[in-house]
Amino acid sequence: MLVFGTRPEAIKMAPLVKEFQKHPESFETIVCVTGQHREMLDQVLKLFEITPDYDLNIMRQGQDLYDVTARVLVGMRDVLREATPDVVLVHGDTTTSTAAALAAFYQQIPVGHIEAGLRTHNIYSPWPEEMNRQITGRIATYNFAPTRLSKQNLMREDVSPDSILVTGNTVIDALRQVVRKIKTDAELDKELEGVLLRSGYDVNRLVEGKRLVLITGHRRENFGDGFIHMCTAIKDLTRKYPEVDFVYPMHLNPNVRKPIHEVFGGDLSDLGNMFFIEPLEYLSFVYLMEKSTIVLTDSGGIQEEAPGLGKPVLVMRDTTERPEALAAGTVKLVGTDYDKIVSEVSALLDDTAYYDAMSQAVNPYGDGLACGRIVEFLNQRK
């Protein structure tokens, strides 16, 4: 059984679902979604043509982490009793993953942790994700680490090496499938151009070398002053580089939208080279990311995806659980510090050699074959 509930989880678990479904003689594949990110989750399910066997549909207006944890835990109790899976696979660091792993543990069902071993060693950064993944790691029977460093983190916590498989990251599997789909389908390319236009950005502006800075931001630890600093830096960059487009697909969370309006004003529809657009489904986001020059983000997954497309990533967080990307030179930490954000974006836009060093660095997160390795590992342990 594969359990997930947010869009990032769905993106990384979808190619694994499809890989298991290729082997019906060896596996009965059961999919349970929690609906922690309802609308954005459904978009990914549609893209990868996945129909869940169970849907907890936990999303409620005004819910907090207590509500999510309780609803997933109780909902999974009943699902696990009915389905009686041999193993439960969860992904990463979400509240869905931790609560589902705990529910499986309560019924003594083995847990497999996809993207295991990521650590910042600071339980409040990112919050609550760092503690979520540490708890899930303690419960897991099988640990699928994306990199050797992730494996080393687990071994330092006395996790048995026999339970760990270094796989690469399944997000690269998903990314390669989607990019291949876009590049080989002219009709789809045109359709995605239309999706972007309806969302608020015309990709036909990107002619004659015009550059695009793609921005995403949604992390809880940045709410408040952090987002104000980020938005102020972005606003000043749009003025410094009027010939560059800045595009920000806004997260639905009001804690994200409020500081944007505080810095940029109430009307976001006519800001010159600054484009605030509606959230994008995964396919459209990859399409836009492929056309970007730089990615400015506080996301975890984008630190893995964007370098796979040769895009430098500036991370608006103080820590990252992906130090392999820092070591490889594909990402740089800028935090929510105004001066760092402005100076690093400026350096990438002004210095070709600096830009090339980041964009041409080798992505440390795998070759797109992670899902096959996970399926083979579990097949050998039946």
State each model region's role.
Residues 1-248, 254-382:
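Nucleotide-activated sugar donor-binding and catalytic core shared by glycosyltransferases
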